[in-house]
């Protein structure tokens, strides 16, 4: 059983304590009502995995845990089997005591693009919206964050996060809650808020930007990473039924349009930090994610287009500040 009591105790003593007015009831309702049919199987993998304390832990350059002496073949096989029970692994990679989880996405590449543009994370309290399996939470801790909180309603991601946490010595500096942004009150408590790979899934993108703003302290920093198209500040792609085989893609603005949206929502010092095309080296099928990936979503005769004929995915990073 995945419990959240440690997180409640942690925030009871800090500036997030007012979250306890709503959070425990929301989590209790989730535990009663909303569990996926495979959740028991996934949570068993978490329960059966041994808690391990790394002899060497690197969260600054990667997410890597090592033991002082190599694990036995039996120990490695047990860890490998339990981790594979939580497939597909989409965001990573992780290197855990000799088991290398080669995830669909090279999320470390995204982090390398984002990190140089951020305010120093040392001592910061951070919220990562749509955090997936929590890979970037650990990298935020590695960059000096005091506390990194991720929210993502996908229950497989919660189990993946908790299993990694056990292998990192039950580290309590990062936490993942199975919630969506719409379930959070206006906490106004985070120094930095990340939203990476979420905006294009929102039916109302400007409402999402307001929700992110409501989580920031005054002078707090927003890090927004999302799909974009080429064009001026009035360019927005509204895909039909699917975009790159994804059904739930609603609005893909140009980077200048997205900058304008952020300014319309009251953010200041908005800047476009990075724009790059997503490659099939960054997102691809692996032995830890064996179904279709980006190569299957692009036109085989013209890799600059999706199978639906839209521009192939490119992603932008924008940085903004709440006044």
Swiss-Prot record:
Pfam families: Methyltransf_9 (PF08003)
Reaction(s) this enzyme catalyzes, per UniProt: carboxy-S-adenosyl-L-methionine + 5-hydroxyuridine(34) in tRNA = 5-carboxymethoxyuridine(34) in tRNA + S-adenosyl-L-homocysteine + H(+)
Residues engaged in binding carboxy-S-adenosyl-L-methionine: 91, 105, 110, 130, 152-154, 181-182, 196, 200, 315
InterPro entries to which the protein is assigned, alphabetical: CmoB, Mo5U34_MeTrfas-like, SAM-dependent_MTases_sf
Subunit field text: Homotetramer.
Keywords, sorted A to Z: Transferase, tRNA processing
Gene Ontology BP annotations: tRNA wobble uridine modification
Enzyme nomenclature, EC number: 2.5.1.-
Name this protein carries in UniProt: tRNA U34 carboxymethyltransferase
Family named by the database record: Belongs to the class I-like SAM-binding methyltransferase superfamily. CmoB family.
One term of GO molecular function: transferase activity, transferring alkyl or aryl (other than methyl) groups
Function according to Swiss-Prot or TrEMBL: Catalyzes carboxymethyl transfer from carboxy-S-adenosyl-L-methionine (Cx-SAM) to 5-hydroxyuridine (ho5U) to form 5-carboxymethoxyuridine (cmo5U) at position 34 in tRNAs.
Top class in the EC scheme: transferase
Protein's gene: cmoB
PANTHER family listed in its UniProt record: METHYLTRANSFERASE, TRNA U34 CARBOXYMETHYLTRANSFERASE
């Amino acid at each position: 059983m995945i419990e959240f009591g440690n997180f409640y105790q942690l925030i009871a003593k800090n500036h997030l304590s007012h979250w306890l007015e709503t959070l425990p009831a929301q989590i209790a309702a989730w535990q009663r009502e909303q569990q996926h049919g495979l959740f028991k199987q996934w949570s068993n993998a978490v329960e059966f995995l041994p808690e391990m304390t790394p002899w060497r832990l690197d969260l600054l350059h990667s997410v890597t845990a090592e033991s002082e002496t190599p694990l036995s073949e039996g120990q490695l096989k047990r860890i490998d089997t339990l981790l594979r029970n939580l497939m597909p692994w989409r965001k990573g990679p992780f290197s855990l005591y000799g088991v290398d989880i080669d995830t669909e996405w090279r999320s470390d590449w995204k982090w390398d693009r984002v990190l140089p543009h951020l305010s120093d994370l040392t001592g910061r309290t951070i919220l990562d919206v749509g955090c997936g399996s929590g890979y970037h939470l650990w990298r935020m801790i590695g960059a000096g964050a005091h506390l990194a909180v991720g929210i993502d309603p996908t229950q497989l991601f919660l189990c993946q996060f908790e299993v990694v946490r056990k292998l990192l010595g039950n580290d309590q500096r990062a936490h993942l809650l199975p919630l969506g942004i719409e379930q959070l009150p206006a906490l106004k408590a985070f120094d930095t808020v990340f939203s990476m790979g979420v905006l294009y899934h929102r039916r109302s993108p400007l409402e999402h930007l307001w929700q992110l703003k409501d989580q920031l302290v005054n002078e707090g920093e927003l890090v927004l990473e999302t799909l974009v198209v080429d064009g001026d500040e009035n360019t927005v792609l509204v895909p039909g039924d699917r975009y790159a085989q994804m059904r739930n893609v609603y609005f893909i603005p140009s980077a200048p349009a997205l900058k304008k949206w952020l300014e319309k929502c009251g953010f200041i010092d908005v800047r476009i930090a990075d724009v790059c095309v997503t490659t099939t080296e960054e997102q691809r099928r692996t032995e830890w994610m064996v179904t279709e990936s980006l190569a299957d979503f692009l036109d085989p005769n013209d890799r600059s287009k999706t199978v639906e004929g839209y521009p192939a995915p490119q992603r932008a990073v924008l940085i903004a500040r709440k006044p």
